Amino acid sequence: MRGCPPLRQPLYFFSMADQTQKMISLLGRMRKQMNGAVADAMYYYGQNYGLNYGVSLPTIREIASTEGKDHSLAQYLYKQQVRELRLAALHIADPAQLSCAEASTWAEGIINSEVAEEMAFAVLSLSPHLAAIFHTWSSSDNEMLAYAALMAVARRQQTIDVEIITSIKDIVRRHSSSRIIAQGAVALLSAAAQNTELTTAIKESLTALGEGSAADYIREEMEWRLEALQ
């Protein structure tokens, strides 16, 4: 499995003034839905952003959907240090235009598990280059990138093969005490378990996980899940 080559040059050019006007309009609609209590709670649990209005994810998705797919706008919004704009960008981005090379610029914005999950849900799982991006991100020392990669493949069940399952042991060993990596691995293996032809590979992967809290969590979760499928 080959990963992504480095990004060599910008892929999109756009009118800064036009994008700024669209951003201001989106931000105004987001601010009307702000919830300070939610923002404070997210900060307490480590969901740090430059600016956070505490707007719910369903509302962000709904507002973003009115823009349609506009990849250059999404790139612009994603660079802003505002939670709602960064998350909206992931639903405005066109997954078909997420090239393997461009993935590195999106990776820089994955600063917490919330962004990682939305990236996996809205963009990465729908990208035609998912396999290559998975290889690159899952090999990263950045647990958020690895988590996004695991969750994206879990959502696109048909892409899971023996090679991907085998790679989980290396991901878990690299992040042996990470709870979110453990959760991502469980999500992927649970999706893989729907295909009985992969059962042997899953069991071998669980045996090869090694030691650590992440490995223990994965084995415990997968034990009852596999039993339930028998």
PLM segments and residue spans:
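Cationic, low-complexity basic patches in intrinsically disordered or flexible, solvent-exposed regions
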Residues: Q9-P10
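Alpha-helical scaffold domains
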Residues: M16-Q230
